[in-house]
């Protein structure tokens, strides 16, 4: 079975991540059935990040001590529990519980599955194992809304069938995890994941983390609010299209993270910030002119910018951090990212109540563009100062 460990673990990774974005095209149906507005939608979406952060901080070090398999199986169990709660959901509190459980599954799975996929890679795939893990992770996130959108639009039982299918995918993922050999040497210690930013990496961390914040805020916006943009601003009530828009930002991010892997970190973050600015300009145009093609273009361009700035920003931070503190620094970076995927989108929901969805979306886009511009200016200033120092 060892020879099949690599593809089986990659499948399990993707299958579990599918469930974390599966509800995206369904939020409009839940809103109609339970009579809630965009603000409640954003809160339901954002509770996912709370589950991720709890799992990351409480259990982030456990797989090094107890092994990859137990933690992956715990992630599968959380994913199954989330799907079951969504099957029974008839109130907002149950939707919140389902999202928290979904976040727990992602938090338990993401770091552990990434390590397991890399460790299980055969020699011929060692140099591409990290890219495979990235594609499995982000590809699963993108497949979730696409699958659900198609099922909600064209299949019966739109609030049940997507979760029944995901239960099947998750059960197969659990079997895959159970049958493959353990990949960890179990040399770590159980404990809470520490967070820190050493002084020698602080400047780079602040710039990279701000870029990651901007990119993940956009990802949260498209995942939580894009269906509302589509129906309420553009006037198209097609759940498959809503799912495809959410999918496109993840697909663009995944492909970019793989393609930009060898690009110089600082330059990649700068280019990523520039693309985020362009993406937000396109989003503003899409909302002003109620244009579907422009909204899709905004998702793709923003996904490229997010993927480039996030992945290469993480590389810049980790490369400069002391070896013994890299886990702490990278965990702090991920905390910033998951805060970004939740709090700003709740702000969008609050703004939509008083300003309207279109104006709130434009305000969000301008704010993210300003943040990305600050990061870009900081990078260019640091490069100019370094060149001046070298010259003198």
Residue ranges and their predicted role:
Residues 93-102, 293-301:
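Paired small-residue
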Residues 35, 67, 88-93, 156, ...:
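Helix-breaking motifs and short loop linkers at transmembrane-helix boundaries and internal kinks
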Residues 124, 128-178:
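Helix-loop-helix hairpin linking two adjacent transmembrane segments in secondary transporters
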Residues 53-93:
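Conserved MFS/SLC helix-loop-helix module at the cytosolic interface between two early adjacent transmembrane helices
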Residues 306, 314-365:
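A late C-terminal transmembrane helix in Major Facilitator Superfamily
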Residues 98-136:
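Cytoplasmic helix-loop-helix junction between adjacent transmembrane helices
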Residues 268-311:
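C-terminal transmembrane helical hairpin of 12-TM major facilitator-type secondary transporters
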Residues 242-265, 279:
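Transmembrane alpha-helices of Major Facilitator/SLC transporters
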């Amino acid at each position: 079975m060892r020879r099949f460990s690599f593809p089986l673990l990659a499948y399990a990774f993707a299958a579990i991540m599918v469930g974390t974005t599966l509800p995206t095209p369904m939020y409009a149906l839940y809103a109609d059935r339970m009579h809630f507005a965009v603000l409640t939608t954003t809160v339901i979406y954002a509770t996912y990040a709370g589950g991720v952060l709890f799992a990351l901080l409480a259990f982030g070090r456990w797989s090094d001590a107890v092994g990859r398999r137990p933690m992956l199986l715990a992630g599968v169990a959380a994913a199954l529990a989330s799907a079951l709660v969504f099957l029974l959901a008839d109130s907002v509190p149950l939707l919140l519980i389902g999202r928290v459980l979904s976040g727990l599954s992602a938090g338990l799975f993401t770091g552990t599955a990434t390590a397991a996929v890399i460790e299980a890679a055969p020699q011929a795939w060692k140099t591409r194992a990290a890219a495979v893990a990235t594609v499995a992770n982000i590809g699963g996130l993108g497949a979730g809304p696409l699958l659900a959108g198609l099922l909600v639009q064209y299949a019966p039982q739109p609030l049940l069938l997507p979760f029944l299918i995901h239960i099947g995918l998750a059960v197969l993922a659990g079997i895959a995890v159970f049958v493959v050999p353990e990949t960890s040497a179990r040399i770590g210690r159980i404990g809470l994941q520490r967070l820190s930013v050493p002084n020698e990496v602080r400047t780079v961390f602040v710039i990279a983390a701000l870029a990651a914040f901007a990119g993940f805020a956009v990802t949260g916006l498209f995942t939580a609010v894009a269906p509302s943009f589509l129906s309420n601003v553009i006037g198209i009530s097609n759940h498959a299209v809503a799912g495809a828009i959410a999918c496109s930002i993840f697909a663009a991010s995944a492909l970019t993270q793989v393609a930009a892997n060898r690009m110089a970190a600082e330059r990649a973050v700068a280019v990523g910030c520039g693309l985020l600015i362009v993406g937000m300009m396109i989003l503003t145009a899409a909302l002003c002119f109620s244009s579907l093609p422009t909204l899709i273009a905004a998702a793709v361009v923003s996904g490229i910018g997010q993927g480039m700035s996030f992945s290469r920003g993480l590389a810049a931070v980790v490369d400069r951090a002391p070896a013994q503190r890299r886990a702490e620094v990278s965990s702090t970076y991920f905390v910033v990212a998951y805060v970004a995927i939740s709090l700003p989108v709740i702000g969008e929901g609050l703004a939509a109540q008083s300003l309207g969805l279109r104006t709130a979306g434009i305000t969000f886009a301008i704010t993210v563009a300003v943040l990305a511009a600050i990061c870009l200016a900081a990078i260019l200033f640091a490069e100019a100062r370094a060149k001046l120092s070298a010259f003198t």
